[in-house]
Amino acid sequence: MQTRIARSSPCEFDSIDPMHLVMTMPSEREALVRLLRSNPRDPELPQLLAAVESMHPANLGRDLELLRGVWELRWSSSSQPWLRHTPWLDNLQVLDPAQGQGCNLLRFQGPLGSLGSIRVQADLTPIDQQRIGVHFRRGGWVGPKLMALGQPQLLREVQQSLPAWLDITVLDEQLRICRGNAGTVFALLKRPDLNVADFLP
């Protein structure tokens, strides 16, 4: 008894366009954005971050305006809890480079977010095609906006003894990867639902 080996018809493979397969495969950048949204603790993130940094280097001389917006921290190489993504906290960075202003902001998600936020205000200065100088000015609690009382604040001056900066390594309409002066890597996604004017004067 002979065993017959079924062979696929050549036309089954001839009809497949290799370029179509390449174009439909998700890029490293798309995979990174998807993971940052859905699973920011995925162990593949550092490798994807490095790949995207090498393929999509930022150029602030060309794309500085893309920095403007409210950015949400989704991943960080830091071990400090306030520099890492936490499911029950909004960890935001608000940037307006045209006005030379920015702030880091922590607030509870959900109804508790109406109690206010912890903020650190900063002056921003572009230095070169990837580096932004950061001078922290004041930090503390900023309460909710009240019609009769305005917006209560408990802020104090920040004593910054050493220069600080951010190296923006990847920047587009959705994604920002940057490295702080201490070497910490941050990956952030833009929040189009939040307005810069609601956080900066």
Located regions from the model:
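Intrinsically disordered, low-complexity polar regions and short flexible loop motifs
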Residues: 4-6
